[in-house]
């Protein structure tokens, strides 16, 4: 009778600790000797290679299971330790347990009432599927504070932990070392029922098991030895470490038995602890690593598990598979985008299993006759036969020269042959790192000679645009030197959040080659942007060129202050020392080092942290508290939960973590001025930061400690003299906690006064400066503050208070320019209110101009919110005008956040190839599916043509690049002879007959390149758009364009215009996008295959070369450039002379040196731009390099001007280069030389060549970008691995829901709307405009 394995489903996994008894039970041998092999080379009994632990040598048999090498899985042994040792992996856990339990009775030091309450919580969490560990953390926290045991009444002394494994008992001022035996003794006392409170299951994890008395010895198969060429054996690192442990353990045992002095025993015990520590983790902090004699650190247990080379990432997450190949890649334009060229040598090695049937038997016979050496052939034949035991078995036979003919004659139906890879087979093609699904796609094989894999190759705003940072605005052109250090406000589904930037562009608008539009909304809000710059509207993302009057764009209304460059120091080391001395504090150096490590001293206004600290100070002077003394300094923050989370994020930026947010409920009795008493009930949330360094810093920044009602103080001087945006941060945070919420009056169209109160005791009331300072500061924002005085309360300490009641009446100015921070609900209302008041102001102005009837009622605020407001402060405004305009430069930024948007002039706007491979030595992987199911799945889901459109935005991610684009431009802008036209058409796989010539020149019939290209287009395609070569004329002439830049396609025929990147380039290709959307992916693939091959043939016929002479400039151009650069250097000399004489005019907020640098940088930047403009003027459109730039094939005009004219100033961290030798950067310059050339100005061009000093400066500037890129790559890679681990089991079910592997619902509809982004139209489910255009073109409108 046959036996079948019963499949089992894993219900749960329980992790535990190995008990000493269990270690002994699973052990097959007690290991007692450090020796491994005897003189004859056989394993020693009781040694680390004992054959009871398994065998690794051929010929030996395992004494435990009788298996040989490959059969025996290996067995554990054990070492009896002479003294207990701490398991380093549990050192911190042991410390937490020791602090939580009573050393006398072993009970957890919490009362019975609290114990019952916690057990009930745990039962509830277990029942509801919650996280019990948070409750356990609460137990540890509560119990560690107790000093008298509530169970036995004994004193519970404190425990000190010193890494890696040392514990001390604190008894008064004395410290007594706890040995591992002492620790184990305490842990043994803990009853089972208390283990549950500590998060341990006593059945599988008793706490004393964390202190080792028996050490398991892993099987020999886990740590095999190797035989070197010399014949000597080399042991595994784990064996080396175990030898050290046994040797020291034996010595310790002998000394204990021999009655050696305690000092020697302690030394040997510590040494045993060290060897056990490094056996578990040889990279633990505070322990010198164990090393080989060669100096190489040993690779022990922890190192085998963690990191890139560890078990998890290397062996589990990263698989090594059969039927795969890897080699260098190279391009082949003759292949289809669905094809991959495979070297013949690879095709002969990789095989595809194919079953023999009556339909393919003759073909397989021929393959068998070819054998395994000739392609296409067969490597193996598999035949099922009845074995001697009567069961069906598979026999695999290798095909050789001697047996190939035999098998060709005797092959039969039902056999399986493993044949060579052949043309048309489906394979998977992958490039690492595999960051998105297009990193591995299915291709069809084309077997080719040679040894490489081959495959087909196949946005901005005006400089004065303001970008919203965290509560301040900055012009985008001013970000050029600061973009790496700032964070911009971005929107994640209309949830504002801050993000850093990954890129910044400044481009010459003419070189960028896009139309530029000025957009104006109904409230007069304006922005200038290029036609491709994306805007967020109520109908999804639209490019600027697609916007129409009446479209509603998304706005974040504000009138926040502008960023001002100010390098003044706010607080430094001396100021911190003074504060520490004033309070009689200790640990001065420790506090200063903490602040330096967090880069909080010295602190300047320009530092991002200055804005955060202004907010923190504002909150602490409002609802917060600062308690500062030698023993228990802390800062308390109060507010709603969401607002406290925002404060926590800010604190994290400063390097501090707050404690848990707690709910406080209670009531208090208040006595008013007349003696009348009232009971006030309330609740609120708060959290604390118990870090003395933060408390000292806030004190140095002017925060008031203790009871603010009894103290006289004003706004800190650093805030009063700060740039306006810092003042705004302070005020908005203070008002976030103190000012009333915006409320509308009963008639619904005007707001109630905004007010706040400040109470002071009578004795200091008239002398307090705080309210006066606020009044003065608000005047700078155009806001008037009215103050009145009211009687206060009678305090419990006997003091009477008076109250300032301050009211704000300039609502529009307050909402627009200041608003609320750390008060999200108030801030959202403030944004809506600001937009509402602007709308009302416009309405009143229009009414006066147009003399509307006075009885026309203005919309109420509530109705305005419903009609105009979105969420979190975002609103919508209608576009009232769109005009073409011109600017010199355009700019763009890219956010690190996946949101890829930012707020420009109040508008919510977006940031301006699948394998991402180049051919400079990149390698790729190829995998051969081994079953029909796998091949069908790859063909249906993974074929390249199915991935032309990006799953990110629905546009084409695959498209033409480089020569394909240049070729398409040459093809569609020229005429060709009959032979040439025929050759181009045949290259594209088009077999149509030639039409009548389009024109005759000198008796030679010529055929239009436009008509040739049209043969690749599907019938029924109708499209109009502007090519990339468009000159951005003031008035578009459309079909009459003299530059042939307006493309018109009717019924699949190119009537007007040339084809460039905008036609079929990657991401931008409108033709390709339209074909895939309207005719399907296969039509898109056919078009791309045909059009690219014809383009390449056109390049070959016409000739298209670029070289160093393309950057040649005439002598007059070079003289003009030299003159500009000479004048710039003279200006720099004048600036330096003025600086040295002390006559240089200071720039606002800058000292003398900073002003000098700002003037010099400005002069040199202008010089580079002027030199570029001269070069551009002399490079014409007949230049091949220029053609590549304007068609979008490669690079841009800016690259060409740098090659031909001048590189300009090289910078490090946004400034001229100053780091180098003392007094000078390089020894080639005089000490103290401040000139342009001595600090990184490169006046040469790439064409001319750089001098040695210029080359060095250029390398310094380039290195910064390389380091920055490397750091960001590592961070994004780590983030992606974590996301993959978290989300790997999510899938979309057939009912449209998203669920995890347990069937738990994550989303009711994929993406909440059920739309596949790949099938959307650049973010929109349906493109209405495209449908209208199609109808118009169909009926010739």
From Swiss-Prot:
Binds at least 2 Zn(2+) per subunit. It catalyses: RNA(n) + a ribonucleoside 5'-triphosphate = RNA(n+1) + diphosphate. The keyword Transmembrane helix does not apply. Signal peptide: none annotated. One of its GO terms (cellular component) is cytoplasm. Its cofactor is Mg(2+); Zn(2+). Zn(2+) 2 binds at residues 102, 105, 149, 152. Pfam families: Intein_splicing, RNA_pol_Rpb1_1, RNA_pol_Rpb1_2, RNA_pol_Rpb1_3, RNA_pol_Rpb1_4, RNA_pol_Rpb1_5. Mg(2+) binds at residues 918, 920, 922. One of its GO terms (biological process) is intein-mediated protein splicing. Keywords: Autocatalytic cleavage, Cytoplasm, DNA-binding, DNA-directed RNA polymerase, Magnesium, Metal-binding, Nucleotidyltransferase, Protein splicing, Transcription, Transferase, Zinc. Belongs to the RNA polymerase beta' chain family. Part of the RNA polymerase complex. DNA-dependent RNA polymerase (RNAP) catalyzes the transcription of DNA into RNA using the four ribonucleoside triphosphates as substrates. Forms the clamp head domain. PANTHER family: DNA-DIRECTED RNA POLYMERASE (PTHR19376), DNA-DIRECTED RNA POLYMERASE III SUBUNIT RPC1 (PTHR19376:SF32). This is DNA-directed RNA polymerase subunit Rpo1N. It comes from Methanocaldococcus jannaschii (strain ATCC 43067 / DSM 2661 / JAL-1 / JCM 10045 / NBRC 100440).
